[in-house]
C-alpha cells in the first residue's frame, strides 16, 4: 500500500485552537498554574502569593509572586549569588545553598511586611518537620504556595531545600515531610539527622572526605576553590551556621557596587564601536586608497 500523507481538512483547520504561546514553547504548565493562581471568590481582591523557585547553572532564584490581570507582580526576590555577602562563597547551587536562599527570601519578605519580629521561624535547626503556626492576638502568618514550574518532584530535590528554608524562615508554606532527604518510604518517617546534615552541607563534607581518600587528583580539581580559601570538610557546618545567623540579622537587599558609572561604561564601549562615516569622509577614504594604489605602480 502506498504511503499517503495525512492531509489536514478545512474542518480541522477551522476548528483548531492555538495553544498559549508559553505552552507551545514548553515553558508553562497551565494545568498547574491555574490551581496556583485561582483565588477563592469570597476573598475578593486578596492576592494569592506563591513561592517561585527556579535553578540555573550558576544561580538559585526565589521570588514571592502574586498574579493580576495585567501580569504577575513580584513582592520580593532573593538569589544565591547574594550568599557570598553572608559568608557562603562556594557551592551556590547545592542543597544547602537552596535552603539558605529560601531562608533569605523568607526573612526579607517578613521584614518588608513588618512581620519579622512576630514570626521568627525555626532559629535552632534540628531537621524536624515544622509548620509556621499563627500567634495569639496577632496577625496570621504570611501564606505562600510552592511553585516549582516544570521541575520533577523527586524526593530530596533541591527545590524542597528552598521550601524548607522558607518555612524555617517564618513563612507559612503548606507542605508535608515526604519529599525531604531522609524520608523512609517503608516506615513513612523522616530522619531528622540526615535532613539537618543536608541543611548544613553535611552531604558535601562527606563527599569531600570520601573523594580525598579515593582520588586525590579529582578532589583537588573539583574542590579547587575550597582549597584555595582553606575550607575543609569539618568547617562547612560552621560556615552555614554563621551564614544563617547573618541572614537573620540583616536580610535586606543591598545592590552590588559597580566598578564604573553608566557614563564610563558608555565611553568604554564607544572605543570598540565602529562609527558611521559621512559622505565626505567616505570620498576622502576612496581617494586615499586610489592614490596608494597609483603610488605602488
From Swiss-Prot:
The modification Phosphoserine is found at residues 167, 176, 235. GO terms for molecular function: 5S rRNA binding; structural constituent of ribosome. InterPro entries: Rbsml_uL18_euk (IPR005485), Ribosomal_uL18_C_euk (IPR025607). Keywords: Cytoplasm, Isopeptide bond, Nucleus, Phosphoprotein, Ribonucleoprotein, Ribosomal protein, RNA-binding, rRNA-binding, Ubl conjugation. GO terms for biological process: cytoplasmic translation; ribosomal large subunit assembly. It is found in: Cytoplasm; Nucleus. Its main location: cytoplasm. GO terms for cellular component: cytoplasm; cytosol; cytosolic large ribosomal subunit; nucleus. There is a cross-link at residue 164 (Glycyl lysine isopeptide (Lys-Gly) (interchain with G-Cter in ubiquitin)). PANTHER family: LARGE RIBOSOMAL SUBUNIT PROTEIN UL18, RIBOSOMAL PROTEIN L5-RELATED. Component of the ribosome, a large ribonucleoprotein complex responsible for the synthesis of proteins in the cell. The small ribosomal subunit (SSU) binds messenger RNAs (mRNAs) and translates the encoded message by selecting cognate aminoacyl-transfer RNA (tRNA) molecules. The large subunit (LSU) contains the ribosomal catalytic site termed the peptidyl transferase center (PTC), which catalyzes the formation of peptide bonds, thereby polymerizing the amino acids delivered by tRNAs into a polypeptide chain. Belongs to the universal ribosomal protein uL18 family. Component of the large ribosomal subunit (LSU). Mature yeast ribosomes consist of a small (40S) and a large (60S) subunit. The 40S small subunit contains 1 molecule of ribosomal RNA (18S rRNA) and 33 different proteins (encoded by 57 genes). The large 60S subunit contains 3 rRNA molecules (25S, 5.8S and 5S rRNA) and 46 different proteins (encoded by 81 genes). Component of a hexameric 5S RNP precursor complex, composed of 5S RNA, RRS1, RPF2, RPL5, RPL11A/RPL11B and SYO1; this complex acts as a precursor for ribosome assembly. This is Large ribosomal subunit protein uL18. It comes from Saccharomyces cerevisiae (strain ATCC 204508 / S288c). The lineage of its organism: Eukaryota, Fungi, Dikarya, Ascomycota, Saccharomycotina.
Amino acid at each position: 500500500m502506498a504511503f499517503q500523507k495525512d492531509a489536514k481538512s478545512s474542518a480541522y483547520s477551522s476548528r483548531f485552537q492555538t495553544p498559549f504561546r508559553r505552552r507551545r514553547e514548553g515553558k508553562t504548565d497551565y494545568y498547574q498554574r491555574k490551581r496556583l493562581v485561582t483565588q477563592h471568590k469570597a476573598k475578593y481582591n486578596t492576592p494569592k502569593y506563591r513561592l517561585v523557585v527556579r535553578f540555573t547553572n550558576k544561580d538559585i532564584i526565589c521570588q514571592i509572586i502574586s498574579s493580576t490581570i495585567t501580569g504577575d507582580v513580584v513582592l520580593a526576590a532573593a538569589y544565591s549569588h547574594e550568599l557570598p555577602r553572608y559568608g557562603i562563597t562556594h557551592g551556590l547551587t547545592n542543597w544547602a545553598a537552596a535552603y539558605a536562599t529560601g531562608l533569605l527570601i523568607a526573612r526579607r519578605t517578613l521584614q518588608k511586611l513588618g512581620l519579622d519580629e512576630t514570626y521568627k521561624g525555626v532559629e535552632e535547626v534540628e531537621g524536624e518537620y515544622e509548620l509556621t503556626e499563627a500567634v495569639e492576638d496577632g496577625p496570621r502568618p504570611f501564606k505562600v504556595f510552592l511553585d516549582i514550574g516544570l521541575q520533577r518532584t523527586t524526593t530530596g530535590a533541591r527545590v524542597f531545600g528552598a521550601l524548607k528554608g522558607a518555612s524555617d524562615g517564618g513563612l507559612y508554606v503548606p507542605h508535608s515531610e515526604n519529599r525531604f532527604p531522609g524520608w523512609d518510604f517503608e516506615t513513612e518517617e523522616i530522619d531528622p539527622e540526615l535532613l539537618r546534615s543536608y541543611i548544613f552541607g553535611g552531604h558535601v563534607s562527606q563527599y569531600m572526605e570520601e573523594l580525598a581518600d579515593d582520588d586525590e587528583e579529582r578532589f583537588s580539581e573539583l574542590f579547587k576553590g575550597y582549597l584555595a580559601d582553606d575550607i575543609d570538610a569539618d568547617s562547612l557546618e560552621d560556615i552555614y551556621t554563621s551564614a544563617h545567623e547573618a541572614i537573620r540579622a540583616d536580610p535586606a537587599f543591598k545592590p552590588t557596587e559597580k566598578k564604573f558609572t553608566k557614563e564610563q561604561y558608555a565611553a568604554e564601549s564607544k572605543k570598540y564601536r565602529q562609527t558611521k562615516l559621512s559622505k565626505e569622509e567616505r570620498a576622502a577614504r576612496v581617494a586615499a586608497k586610489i592614490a596608494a594604489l597609483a603610488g605602488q605602480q
